[in-house]
């Protein structure tokens, strides 16, 4: 295994109508281009650095088309075969100079199929009509780069908000910043009642939707909205908006510079190989052990390729056999479902899956005294019922504004959670906790309950 580079524009551009490709830019990913015909191209995703297992994220630019030239692009080497492309509710994104914002490619121009010409692999093909020779960019989902985040954080810092503070938590292996954002209207107040909310995102570099949601969260928290002002008074927010800057910069899908899935390193992180995970884990445990602070919630933001909508994953702990504890775990999912049409209680789940061991949610759930969740949002689309009252469901593509709107809805749900915690809001749950458990977790919970009962009887 080794690093495979991205394609670059040739030194000499051929005659107009001969497309040329470029991915040697921040977060770019396209390892090879094979010209099948004058209008069709096979495109090969570059694998993650030092890890050939992951080939999902792509982000490239092409130019030199003739006016109204048609082209078909085939992504031929996806490592993840089962995605929402198979269900017809997924679309890559495109951006041109004429329209300087990302848009979804129309579904009628997208095909996902098994190809006998490619060893019976699943191929994603999409057609596009170029309006001019100017560059056009294509990506798996709406990009959010490390450089883009740094420019935005610099701008936020320049506003001189008294409640906003930016620190360098640690540097990555390639010496990029891992930023720690603190948002708190009363930063000097630690008198036994300080409630803490911890948020992280982008441990998987290809999951750009999580950054757009985090962008929406932070922009709402620093806004003049009355609800944002109240949130800043009742909570201290500690936010790490990008856990894997090296992977994001390199255009990886899952891994860090060294080929590690950082979301499997939380149990025993290395201070030199996984510096962001090492530093964040220490930060979380430090505040959780501080008697003057009360850690309430930790949420790690991700993106999902095999399900639509957004939803939460939670943990099943020993305390989950207590009705009061399980009831409180369900508050945030229900509050978010009330505020956001794209939130799915159907996909919300509390699990103990072995393959999730070592993740932030599972590891910190074992170490911390607070509620720990993963917030997942689809790369592509969400299903929702229309307002006609007929129960008709529609599928709507996610665009940047909708990801950011989810961030705002999440903040509002946190405020409602605070009110419920203080007895100012009543939450009625129609579904018991066990209905949010997969079959395997239900068996685990029953075993835990029996052990608790046996322990009580022996006393």
UniProtKB/Swiss-Prot annotation:
Organism per entry: Caenorhabditis elegans
Domain of life: Eukaryota
Enzyme nomenclature, EC number: 3.4.17.-
Gene3D superfamilies: 2.60.40.3120, Zn peptidases
Name of the gene encoding the protein in the UniProt record: ccpp-6
PANTHER family hit by this protein: CYTOSOLIC CARBOXYPEPTIDASE (PTHR12756), CYTOSOLIC CARBOXYPEPTIDASE 6 (PTHR12756:SF9)
Similarity comment: family membership: Belongs to the peptidase M14 family.
Keywords attached to this entry: Carboxypeptidase, Cytoplasm, Hydrolase, Metal-binding, Metalloprotease, Protease, Zinc
Transmembrane in keyword set: no
Example of a GO MF term: zinc ion binding
Subcellular location: Cytoplasm
Sequence positions that bind Zn(2+): 204, 207, 302
Cofactors required: Zn(2+)
Active site: 376 (proton donor/acceptor)
Tissues in which the protein is found: Expressed in labial and amphid neurons.
Predominant localisation class: cytoplasm
PROSITE patterns: PEPTIDASE_M14 (PS52035)
Protein name in UniProt: Cytosolic carboxypeptidase 6
Outcome of gene disruption: RNAi-mediated knockdown at the L1 or L4 larval stages or in the egg-laying apparatus causes a reduction in egg-laying due to a defect in the egg-laying apparatus muscles.
Catalytic function, reaction form: (L-glutamyl)(n+1)-gamma-L-glutamyl-L-glutamyl-[protein] + H2O = (L-glutamyl)(n)-gamma-L-glutamyl-L-glutamyl-[protein] + L-glutamate
One Pfam family of this chain: Peptidase_M14
GO CC terms, sorted: ciliary basal body; cytoplasm; microtubule cytoskeleton
Domain Peptidase M14 positions: 142-418
GO biological process, alphabetically ordered: egg-laying behavior; protein deglutamylation; proteolysis
Cofactor note: Binds 1 zinc ion per subunit.
Function: Metallocarboxypeptidase that catalyzes the removing of polyglutamate side chains that are present on the gamma-carboxyl group of glutamate residues of tubulin in sensory cilia. Probably via the deglutamylation of tubulin, promotes microtubule stability required for axon regrowth after injury. Also regulates microtubule dynamics in uterine muscle cells.
């Amino acid at each position: 295994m080794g690093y495979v580079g991205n394609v670059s524009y040739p030194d000499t551009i051929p005659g107009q109508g001969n497309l040329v490709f470029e991915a040697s830019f921040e977060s770019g990913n396209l390892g090879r281009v094979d010209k099948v015909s004058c209008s069709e191209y096979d495109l090969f995703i570059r694998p993650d650095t030092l890890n050939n297992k992951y080939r999902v994220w792509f982000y490239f630019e092409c130019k030199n088309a003739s006016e109204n030239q048609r082209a078909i692009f085939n992504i031929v080497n996806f490592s993840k075969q089962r995605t929402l492309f198979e269900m017809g509710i997924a679309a890559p994104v495109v951006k041109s100079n004429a329209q300087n914002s990302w848009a979804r490619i129309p579904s009628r121009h997208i095909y996902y199929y098994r190809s006998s010409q490619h060893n019976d692999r699943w191929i994603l093909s999409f057609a596009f009509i170029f309006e001019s020779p100017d560059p056009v960019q294509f990506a798996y989902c709406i990009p959010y780069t490390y450089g883009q985040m740094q420019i935005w954080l610099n701008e936020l810092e320049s506003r001189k908000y008294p409640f906003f503070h930016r620190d360098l938590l640690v540097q990555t292996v390639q010496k990029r910043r891992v930023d720690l954002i603190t948002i708190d209207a009363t930063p000097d107040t630690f008198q036994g009642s300080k409630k803490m909310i911890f948020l992280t995102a982008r441990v998987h570099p290809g999951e750009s939707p999580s950054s757009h949601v985090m962008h929406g969260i932070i922009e709402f928290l620093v806004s003049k909205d009355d609800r944002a002002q109240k949130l800043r008074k009742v909570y201290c927010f500690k936010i790490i908006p990008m856990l894997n800057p090296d992977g994001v910069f390199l255009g990886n899908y899952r891994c860090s510079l060294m080929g590690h899935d950082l979301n499997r390193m939380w149990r025993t992180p290395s201070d030199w190989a996984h510096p962001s995970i090492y530093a964040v884990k220490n930060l979380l445990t430090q505040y959780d052990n501080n008697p003057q602070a009360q850690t309430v919630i930790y949420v790690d933001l991700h993106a999902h390729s095999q399900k639509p909508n957004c939803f939460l994953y939670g943990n099943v702990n020993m305390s989950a056999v207590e009705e009061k504890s399980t009831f409180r775990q369900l508050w945030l999912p229900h509050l978010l479902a009330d505020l956001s049409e794209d939130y799915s209680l159907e996909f919300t789940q509390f699990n103990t899956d072995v393959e999730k061991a070592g993740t932030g949610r599972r590891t910190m759930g074992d170490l911390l005294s607070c509620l720990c969740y993963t917030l997942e949002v689809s790369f592509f689309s969400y299903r929702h019922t229309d307002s006609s009252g007929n129960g008709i469901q529609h599928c709507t593509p996610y665009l940047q504004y909708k990801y950011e709107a989810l961030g705002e809805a999440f903040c509002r749900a946190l405020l409602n959670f605070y009110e419920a915690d203080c007895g100012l809001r009543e939450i009625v749950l129609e579904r018991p906790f066990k209905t949010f458990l997969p079959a395997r977790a239900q068996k685990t919970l029953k075993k835990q309950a029996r052990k608790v009962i046996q322990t009580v009887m022996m006393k």
